[in-house]
Amino acid sequence: MSSIQGTSGSSPERLPNSREDEGMNPEGVTPSGQTISFSAVGKSTSAEDIQQLALPIIQSDAMASSPSVGGAVGEVEVAEIIADVMEKNDANVQKLDEDMEALLQAISSSEEQLESPGVRNKSALKGTNRSNSHREEIARNQRLRSLSVRHGLAYNRHSLRRLARGIRHHAGLVTASFATLHKTLRAVPQEDLKSILGKDSDTVLARLHKLGLEVNEKGEWRLRANGEVGSINQSICNLARSAERLHDDGPLSINDQASEEEVTACCSAGRRACQFLQEHLMGALRAIYYQILRFFHWISRRVEVEPEDTDYYMRPGIFINPYASYLSSSPSVEDPRSLRDRLRDGGALSGEDTLFSMPQDESLDSESVSDDDRGFQ
């Protein structure tokens, strides 16, 4: 099956190395020295297989789960917990950039092998005494049998492209929400804001400064493009654009001399790489929704100014994750609860200290949201 290998240390459990198809095994190497390779097998890949492959790289406290706050805690503890989670964003985004480089390299290698005239020929076409018509018939049958596999790869590539467009849309939502928070804070005098935040004021203001929202010498709030929000938004957009560039409108043009086994092996490797790439993009999306937007909404509630209804997913008093169905199907191994249960807990806070208030109806369910609302065009 697909394998993730490291140049030092042992390989992850239940991820055996494949030597048999080494020539057909595209791989990429991260700057840290880790080798990511995709080896094809003769069976379909399940969602559990992809999760098993993705977890060793994308799993982290900040990405795999929302901040867990138990019991009734004070304002200082809430701010410290949020600040601690936010501190991990830079490292997570950097790791995504590094891993993505290796993944894109692996996908490109897989596609080059599919189209290369130098692909090894393991088929029965090596008989030189057979007639040309017989060889052509065998080749035609092989192409027909491999067509479904090729279309499967094309479908995965198309789905990944749509996902990338949607993620770019929601990365922009973070920037728009940051601008809304900027407008909200401008309406609150500095002294009043510090009084409202109480002991949390220094912590929250320092966090806002690092995110890219600061007070200038005139006492006015100013947005900085080089803050964490701008950096994360740009990184996510770069990853999405890289994913979009991998696609064309139809199946790959495969070398006619390749056998059915070779075509299946390469297509399976490409599909695994695409699915693995989706896991990385979803990990980045978790970081956005579980950390930054919750922090913005918490501040808005503290200053008692409801955020504007600028997006379907950020209504006043409601936090809606458009990917709730997807994420709830892939829960963190550290938190077996569903996404709905985790969000309904609201961080186990009470009253005015709740990071966001959850509706009692079914508005959290994302199944009723259309593709256009999700940002998929």
UniProtKB/Swiss-Prot annotation:
Give the disulfide map.
none
Q: Compositionally biased, Polar residues: which spans?
A: 1-11, 31-43
Bias kind Basic and acidic residues: ranges:
334-345
Map out region (Disordered) in residue numbers. Answer: 1-43, 109-141, 328-377
What's the domain of life for this entry?
Answer: Bacteria
Q: Which family does it belong to?
A: Belongs to the chlamydial CPn_0499/CT_392/TC_0671 family.
What's the name of the protein? Uncharacterized protein CT_392
